[in-house]
Amino acid sequence: INMPIAYIVRARFVGLRDLGPCLPPQSAFQIIQGLETVTLRMQKHCDNAAKVAEFLSKHNKVTKVIYAGLDEDEAGKRANKYLKGGFGALCGFELKGGKQSGQKFIDNLNMFYHVANIGDARSLAIHPATTTHSQLSDEDMLATGVSPSYVRLSIGIEHIDDIISDLSNALDNA
């Protein structure tokens, strides 16, 4: 071998140190369980998100709903063409009342988790203007597509009646 021994040792042992020599059995089992049920979970995510978007589009405190399944513009046409099994679990909307109404909405949620990540089986909500984008000026925030009252939801697989009830309560108290 013409490679320096230090490189060979590092290439072999750093990966083992950081990642382990193999996947633990419990982790392998959980990955298999997750893969076997991913289609069921994604269908539930998509179904719930479509119902939430429809609910939000009819609520008097909501000024705009951002969901591919509702869009009648060019993006909506592309979504209808390419997303045959559903439009995903993400749904955004804007409230009347500005930044304060967005924060009050989040504060009044009971079932939704207030976190910045997406893709969980649980329903998640975030108000970017007071969290992930709070360091930006109002102009910069708008330039990134985030209005002061914008709320982003990642809709989970809970029962749709529970999801809509929690959203309705939070909207009524925002």
Regions found by a protein language model. Give the residues of each.
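Active-site C-terminal subdomain of aminotransferase-like
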Residues: I1-L90, E94-R122
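PLP-dependent enzyme catalytic core of the Aspartate aminotransferase-like
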Residues: R41, D107, S123-A174
